[in-house]
Swiss-Prot record:
Keywords: Endoplasmic reticulum, Glycoprotein, Hydrolase, Membrane, Protease, Signal-anchor, Transmembrane, Transmembrane helix. It comes from Paracoccidioides brasiliensis (strain Pb18). InterPro entries: LexA/Signal_pep-like_sf (IPR036286), Pept_S26A_signal_pept_1_Ser-AS (IPR019756), Peptidase_S26 (IPR019533), Peptidase_S26B (IPR001733). Component of the signal peptidase complex (SPC) composed of a catalytic subunit SEC11 and three accessory subunits SPC1, SPC2 and SPC3. The complex induces a local thinning of the ER membrane which is used to measure the length of the signal peptide (SP) h-region of protein substrates. This ensures the selectivity of the complex towards h-regions shorter than 18-20 amino acids. SPC associates with the translocon complex. Belongs to the peptidase S26B family. The keyword Phosphoprotein does not apply. The active site is at residues 53, 92, 139. This is Signal peptidase complex catalytic subunit SEC11. Residues 183-194 are annotated as: C-terminal short (CTS) helix.
Length: 197
């Protein structure tokens, strides 16, 4: 097996160039993702619909484009949120909005300089109740234990601004079958390294 790699090891400069080209492709993709995150103000500017809870609006496997620059979310808007303590994005529609009363302050326990204290924020945060279009009940059962609504600033990843149907099935297949991901990455890496210019 090692004898088949001998022609590639004979010219280490070409092999190094190919490895660096592969690293350049990966770093460019990473920079594009981070740039898109900054532009949209979202940690995940592109997500895939993982369930059928939003049918008929979105099907499982649809690729969604998010925007998180709006200070408020309107009732009827479709948002993506993360449940506290879990890293699974959920795509559902806002059913109700509970704005904070003017002049009321949010209080959080914050450690400052090693001491625990209370920090007040004069910027009110919008509270939201969501529901999947294809679900019978609202999402209070999906929220973290003791959570009755979503916090606009803490829980919302972004609002849906566009989508491409069924393209996300590749992501679903790769997450449901980890061996397929390894095979695909190995194949791509092998093709880059073995490619001759």
């Amino acid at each position: 097996m090692l004898s088949s790699l001998a022609p590639y090891m004979a010219n280490p400069r070409q092999t190094l160039t190919q490895v660096l080209n592969f690293a350049l492709v990966l770093s460019t993709a990473f920079m594009l993702w981070k740039g898109l995150s900054v532009i949209t103000n979202s940690t995940s500017p592109i997500v895939v619909v993982l369930s059928g809870s939003m049918e008929p609006a979105f099907q499982r496997g649809d690729l969604l484009f998010l925007w998180n620059r709006s200070p408020r979310v309107d009732v009827g808007e479709i948002v993506v949120y993360n449940v506290r303590g879990k890293d699974i994005p959920i795509v559902h529609r806002v059913m109700r909005s509970f704005p904070e009363l003017p002049g009321r302050e949010d209080k959080k326990n914050v450690k400052k300089g090693g001491e625990e204290g209370e920090e007040t924020s004069s910027t009110p945060s919008q509270k939201l109740l969501t529901k999947g279009d294809n679900n019978m009940a609202d999402d209070t059962e999906l929220y973290a234990q003791g959570q009755e609504y979503l916090d606009r600033k803490e829980d919302i990843v972004g609002s849906v601004r566009g989508y491409v149907p069924t393209v996300g099935y590749v992501t679903i297949l790769l997450s449901e079958h980890p061996w397929l991901r390894s095979v695909l990455l190995g194949f791509m890496g092998l093709m880059v390294v073995l490619q001759r210019e």
